Amino acid sequence: MSQDTKYEIMYIIRPNIDEEAKTALVERFDTILKDNGAEVIESKDWEKRRLAYEMNGFREGIYHIVNVTSPSTAGAINEFDRLAKINDDIIRHMIVKVEA
């Protein structure tokens, strides 16, 4: 029996995205996690913040946080990581394993 692992995913969305596109982006990435075996516990916008330094030409971004549990054998985290790297609407992302 594989133990479920808890993860916190934080990603920064470009600030000039319209609300409808942002909602679609968040839903798309939540669905990617669910379809690959993860359970999304919480998915919420944190706030629009100024960045410490310019990234991809932006000085601020919309921070979004997702709390997830996923079996270690599921590819949900790897698939999220792969797709977030190639998405132009996501400036940066970080995946952290939460210790129990």
Curated annotation (Swiss-Prot):
Sorted UniProt keywords: Ribonucleoprotein, Ribosomal protein, RNA-binding, rRNA-binding
SUPFAM superfamilies the UniProt entry points to: Ribosomal protein S6
GO molecular function: small ribosomal subunit rRNA binding; structural constituent of ribosome
Pfam families: Ribosomal_S6
GO cellular component: cytoplasm; ribonucleoprotein complex; ribosome
GO biological process per UniProt: translation
Record function comment: Binds together with bS18 to 16S ribosomal RNA.
PANTHER family for the chain: MITOCHONDRIAL 28S RIBOSOMAL PROTEIN S6, SMALL RIBOSOMAL SUBUNIT PROTEIN BS6M
Similarity field: Belongs to the bacterial ribosomal protein bS6 family.
Official protein name in the record: Small ribosomal subunit protein bS6
Source organism per UniProt: Enterococcus faecalis (strain ATCC 700802 / V583)
Encoding gene (name): rpsF
